[in-house]
Amino acid sequence: MELKLLQDNGTLGAGVQASPEVFEREYNEALVHQVVVAYQANARSGNRAQKDREQVKHTTKKPWRQKGTGRARAGMSSSPLWRGGGRIFPNSPEENFSQKVNKKMYRAGMRSILSQLAREGRLNVVDQFSLDAPKTKVLADKVKAMGLDSVLIIVDQVSENLYLASRNLHKVAVCEPQHADPLALVQYKKVLVSKAAIAKIEELLK
């Protein structure tokens, strides 16, 4: 599989050979969907909470007597039927949203995503990607000069300059091969991978 080399001025240069085992797989939409949804579900922190009738602060006094008023019987104002009462099935911070995806399936999903990105021309290779100073403007100008808008940059090792410069650009993300995730790969319009990172990705996903 040949991946196009992207120059600093935005032109495409000679191709770079990549493993067909990783970058030339058939696209499996169902598997990719499962892997992305599982990744998002596992990232949920469970930070929502509601109160049931036991936790709501209300008096336990019976609102009115059981019989003789003509009104429907009522036990206490914390009933879920009442305004301001507890929830019948409240959400809890202890809820478990995690979904299990086997390592084999996860790797297959990642290979499928990378292969589809390569087919669509959204995956390009660079010799290396580095900055001389930790300046956001320097990175923004470099990305713009390459004709990129929304981009995920995968490098062998993220330097401090690159990390600091990318923090304030919401359409630019930087990571190392072992930290690349399926959501980021499908979320950004373009993916830039350094030559050294290509070798690492192939090693991780074979």
UniProtKB/Swiss-Prot annotation:
GO molecular function: rRNA binding; structural constituent of ribosome
Bias type Basic residues, positions: 58-70
GO (cellular component) term, any one: ribosome
Keyword Glycosyltransferase carried by entry: no
Listed InterPro entries: Ribosomal_uL4 (IPR002136), Ribosomal_uL4-like (IPR013005), Ribosomal_uL4_dom_sf (IPR023574)
Keywords: Ribonucleoprotein, Ribosomal protein, RNA-binding, rRNA-binding
Ranges for region Disordered: 43-94
Pfam family, one: Ribosomal_L4
GO annotation, biological process: translation
Similarity comment: family membership: Belongs to the universal ribosomal protein uL4 family.
Database matches in HAMAP family: Ribosomal_uL4_B
PANTHER family named among the record's database cross-references: 50S RIBOSOMAL PROTEIN L4, LARGE RIBOSOMAL SUBUNIT PROTEIN UL4M
Subunit structure comment from the entry: Part of the 50S ribosomal subunit.
Function of the protein: One of the primary rRNA binding proteins, this protein initially binds near the 5'-end of the 23S rRNA. It is important during the early stages of 50S assembly. It makes multiple contacts with different domains of the 23S rRNA in the assembled 50S subunit and ribosome. Forms part of the polypeptide exit tunnel.
Name the UniProt record assigns to this protein: Large ribosomal subunit protein uL4
Gene coding for it: rplD
